[in-house]
């Protein structure tokens, strides 16, 4: 059964870049947050219908787990650790993968607000996330979310035995992918 690697952290911390690098290194499937968030936002507006977004993701994970020979999945997510709906979603995902014989591991990415503001508008970010094309608006939302939610843990992570923290100001996406793969002994598909 496949495992799930949840890469989480605040906006523009490097989740997609690290997830992409990890997928290239391991051959795992890369399922970034905006693959579901963008279509839901196009229909209902950004931030609307969070229950629908969670249900869509659960349905996709359920179908993925039903596929024979499905590789492990890398999922990126802005997890508001103090938001009950986000925590409930993660609990459901953990239960789903564990019931199927897989495990869920968490990679928390951290970086300073000034660094993340600089990263808004990078080519990879814009290619994966149409909602980020208005860079000043995306930067304003980043600052707003920073003040509104707890987007990084502070020694109180609910799954400490499956938790790795990496500072993306210290490591490149490729270096983060190498550290993640080494930490959980993921095979290197690139060799």
Q: Which role fits each region the language model picked out?
A:
Residues 7:
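Hydrophobic anchor at the beta1->P-loop junction of P-loop NTPases
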Residues 10:
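P-loop (Walker A) phosphate-binding loop of NTP-binding proteins
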Residues 14:
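Conserved glycine(s) of the Walker
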Residues 17-65:
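Conserved substrate/cofactor phosphate-moiety recognition/catalytic segment
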Residues 122-175:
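Small-molecule kinase domains that catalyze NTP-dependent phosphoryl transfer to phosphate-bearing small molecules
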């Amino acid at each position: 059964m496949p495992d799930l690697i949840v890469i989480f952290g605040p906006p523009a911390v490097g989740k997609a870049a690290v997830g992409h690098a990890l997928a290239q290194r391991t051959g795992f499937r890369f399922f970034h947050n905006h693959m579901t968030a963008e279509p839901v936002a196009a229909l209902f507006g950004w931030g609307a219908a969070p229950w629908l977004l969670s249900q869509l993701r659960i349905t996709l994970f359920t179908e993925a787990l039903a596929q024979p020979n499905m590789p492990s999945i890398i999922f990126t997510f802005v997890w508001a650790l103090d938001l009950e709906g986000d925590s409930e979603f993660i609990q459901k995902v953990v239960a789903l993968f564990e019931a199927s014989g897989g495990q869920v591991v968490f990679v928390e990415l951290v970086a300073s607000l000034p660094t993340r503001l600089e990263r808004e508008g990078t080519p990879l970010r814009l290619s994966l996330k149409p909602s980020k094309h208005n860079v000043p608006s995306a930067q304003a939302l980043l600052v707003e979310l920073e003040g509104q939610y707890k987007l990084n843990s502070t020694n109180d992570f609910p799954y400490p035995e499956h938790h790795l923290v990496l500072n993306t100001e210290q490591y490149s996406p490729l270096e983060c992918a190498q550290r993640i793969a080494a930490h959980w002994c993921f095979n290197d598909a690139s060799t």
